[in-house]
Amino acid sequence: MHALPALPVLYSFRRCPYAMRARLALAISGEPHEHREVVLKNKPAAMLAASPKGTVPVLVLPDGEVLDESLDIMRWALARNDPAQWLSPPEVAAHETEALIAGNDGDFKRHLDRYKYPNRYPDESGGDAAGFALQHRSAANGWLAQLDTQLHKGWLMGDRASLADMAILPFIRQFAHTDAEWFAAQPWPRLQGWLAAFEASALYQSVMGKHAAWQPELSNS
């Protein structure tokens, strides 16, 4: 039987947008934790024991509780300490934040996956992966234009960052980097500036450092 960790343990993968949003909340909250970088093709047994579904992020708390949904990890960290007031955007009700995040995690994520990884969907692409990818890129444009409009005060929910921004930005980053030249040419100046400011921020830089893959035999836990 494994001893419970002294600190919360985060199983993460650097480029995963779900893991990235969890790391952002943990970083802004200042909540101490142990970072365990995962190789997705060789997931550690300890992570799978904690969360059999096998996706990152997973946060194992010192009392044994497991959080394996990225938004739950964000809310847990921010409930403990929310110095930037991400949970209290100035101009909106909580349900508006939830609706915006749901739009990102639903239809937009579906289009993002098929744009970035068209070869994963041979049954849907009809043998034309390139055309299939462009079809889903086009299908995502309405959502991106909506975000561009909503950013008229600089952030999605007003004049400062909120949970919605930090939950959604990692996915916009992934979309933009799929074809950076195309993205830069689109008529979304607010969206492009929002993403650029995020990627230039100290917070973003702090959560994007590279980690060696976690090796259980090298861990003290």
Residue ranges and their predicted role:
Residues 1-134:
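GST-like domain detector, emphasizing the conserved glutathione-binding G-site
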Residues 189-221:
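Long hydrophobic alpha-helical segments typical of transmembrane helices together
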Residues 96-196:
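GST-like fold's C-terminal all-alpha helical module
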Residues 76, 178, 207:
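Residues that scaffold the ATP/ADP-binding catalytic core of kinase and kinase-like folds
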